[in-house]
């Protein structure tokens, strides 16, 4: 009967150990996934910080600092959660060690029981009673240890559930922060695009105004040049007509018109000025 109880206790301990190992493996996998997600979020946050430092203004920087402070608080909570996980892992190692010790004890006890059965024929009833009492006391101790291990297992399971709940809440908080960061980033990108469009429209309007001004100045300079050219050509043609008229049609026009226009003093001065150039030197040409 004692051997059956010991075997059943051993099976229970082995199954509990396997369940505990599976739970701890799931916790480790969840922690690894959470660490990968946190690393990705940190890389995304660093990228957003870099972009915001390049294209941000003081108000946006202040808002980003607040968001960064919130993220740092979340990271600190995650670090505390990781420390709690490490503590649970250490406790799990302790439990595994105690379970292995208990298994070794059970193995030794079972071997003793087998040896007891083998030597049962050679022992006396008093010795058998003493050995049976020893086995009962050892079974009681093992049951106490098993109860303690069960309590530790329940405690670890509760902590694992609490940790899973904390991980879920932290993932929800990270998702909400990521959505807020993406929304802020999109708003900043939209405002930047709108400002770029307004600057482009303003530069286009300024270019159009400059084009209109340059075209107006070019047209004005062309009109002035044309007027000067036409005036010069008109005066040259008028002067040609006057010279032609004086040369071939009415050579005495100035002689007849100047006395009517100018006074005698002016005519005398004009005559003194023009007489040397109009007088022909013919003395050398006349016959002697």
Curated annotation (Swiss-Prot):
Coiled-coil annotated residue ranges, if any:
10-189
**Which cysteine residues pair off into disulfide bonds?**
none
From which source organism is this entry? Mus musculus (Mouse)
GO cellular component, alphabetical, reads:
endoplasmic reticulum membrane; nuclear membrane
The entry sums up its family as follows:
Belongs to the TMCO5 family.
Q: Which gene encodes it?
A: Tmco5a
Q: What is its membrane topology?
A: Single-pass membrane protein
Query: Does the keyword section mention Metal-binding?
Result: no
Residues crossing the lipid bilayer are: 227-249
Q: Where in the cell is it found?
A: Endoplasmic reticulum membrane; Nucleus membrane
Protein name as it appears in the record: Transmembrane and coiled-coil domain-containing protein 5A
Q: Which InterPro entries match?
A: SMCO2/5
Where, by tissue, is this protein expressed?
A: Only detected in testis (at protein level).
What UniProt keywords are attached to this protein's entry? Coiled coil, Endoplasmic reticulum, Membrane, Nucleus, Transmembrane, Transmembrane helix
Pfam families documented for this protein? TMCO5 (PF14992)
PANTHER family documented for this protein: TRANSMEMBRANE AND COILED-COIL DOMAIN-CONTAINING PROTEIN 5A, TRANSMEMBRANE AND COILED-COIL DOMAIN-CONTAINING PROTEIN 5B-RELATED
Q: Specify whether Transferase is a keyword of the entry.
A: no
């Amino acid at each position: 009967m004692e051997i059956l109880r010991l075997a059943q206790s051993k099976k229970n301990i082995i199954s509990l150990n396997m369940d505990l190992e599976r739970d701890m493996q799931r916790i480790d996998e969840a922690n690894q996934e959470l660490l990968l997600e946190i690393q990705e979020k940190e890389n995304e946050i660093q990228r957003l910080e870099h972009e915001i430092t390049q294209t941000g203004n003081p108000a946006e920087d202040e808002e980003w600092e607040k968001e960064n402070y919130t993220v740092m608080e979340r990271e600190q909570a995650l670090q505390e959660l990781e420390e709690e996980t490490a503590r649970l892992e250490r406790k799990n190692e302790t439990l595994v060690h105690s379970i292995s010790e208990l298994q070794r004890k059970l193995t030794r006890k079972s071997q003793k029981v087998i040896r007891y059965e083998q030597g049962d024929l050679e022992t006396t009833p008093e010795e058998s009673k003493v050995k049976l009492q020893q086995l009962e006391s050892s079974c009681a101790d093992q049951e106490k240890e098993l109860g303690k291990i069960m309590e530790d297992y329940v405690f670890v399971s509760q902590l694992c559930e609490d940790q899973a709940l904390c991980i879920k809440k932290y993932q929800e908080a990270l998702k909400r922060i990521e959505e807020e960061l993406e929304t802020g980033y999109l708003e900043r990108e939209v405002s930047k695009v709108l400002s770029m469009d307004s600057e482009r429209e303003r530069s286009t309007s300024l270019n159009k105004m400059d084009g209109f001004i340059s075209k107006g100045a070019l047209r004005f300079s062309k009109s002035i040049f044309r007027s000067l050219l036409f005036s010069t050509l008109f005066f040259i043609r008028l002067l040609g007509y006057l010279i032609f008229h004086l040369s071939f049609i009415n050579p005495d026009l100035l002689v007849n018109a100047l006395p009517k226009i100018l006074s005698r003093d002016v005519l005398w001065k004009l005559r003194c000025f023009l007489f040397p150039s109009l007088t022909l030197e013919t003395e050398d040409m006349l016959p002697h």
